[in-house]
Amino acid sequence: MKVKVISVLEDNYMYLVIEESTRDAVAVDAAVPKRLLEIVRKEDVVLRAVLITHHHWDHARGNEELVRLCPGLRVYGADERIGALTHRVAPDEELTFGAIRVRCLFTPCHTKGHMCYFMWEDGSLDAPALFSGDTLFVGGCGQFLEGTAEQMYTNLTQVLGDLPKETKVFCGHECTVRNLKFALKVEPENEAVKKKLAWARQRDDEDLPTVPSTLQEEFLYNPFLRVTEEAVQKFTGRKEPVEVLRALRTEKDNFKKPKERPHPQAMLAFDWGLFAPFLEKK
């Protein structure tokens, strides 16, 4: 199972998961169809389905166009607000695409219909992959836009946290540097945070992605997975894990975003007219 990381818009990621023996492929969060189909042609694969983590435009806006360009394409997701949806999936439902297996992990909070996708390939020794959308990021987690701290705690500690620690994490956005800057504020003595931040800055300087991480790594430097650690509790002034998580999210929401260089893929959004509706004169 090969995963192609595709940078689009300002800081989004799409993914193309390829079964190398058959050259069939499944995409995750196909927001920019033209870019996705460029990669499909370059890799010489057949796109069979699209898995959508949630309905937000920067993850799902390309569905209608993609279905038009690829007749018969299946679009999977859990939220009725997802455009061009052909298959509504249920929590813990398993899907099969050739040798690629998918378990649908329901993680409501960022949106009420958010679904993560846990993938592995039958007979392969490769580590499984988690496509976590806007629930779990490298060094962070998504905002609680339609849910609660209790829900996110369950998502992070049980639904995702119980997966094999070698699982590779492919998240929905490139926000690692700013996440780890916040993590360093929370745990200024955490050497794992310092090391990962230095690495992420180097990757950013080279316009390279910081995905995937692994679940095992995330438990070392991601404060939202470290709510039982003394240093994290001291930072928040809370002891109960859900309250620690709630306080962390509030602090992160108010954390000043560092000035980052514009991602080179951001300008492609203008080239493809993605912002045209917002720029038209009224």
Swiss-Prot record:
CDD domains: hydroxyacylglutathione_hydrolase_MBL-fold. Binds 2 Zn(2+) ions per subunit. It comes from the Eukaryota. Its cofactor is Zn(2+). One of its GO terms (biological process) is methylglyoxal catabolic process to D-lactate via S-lactoyl-glutathione. This is Hydroxyacylglutathione hydrolase-like protein. It comes from Gallus gallus (Chicken). Its EC number is 3.1.2.-.
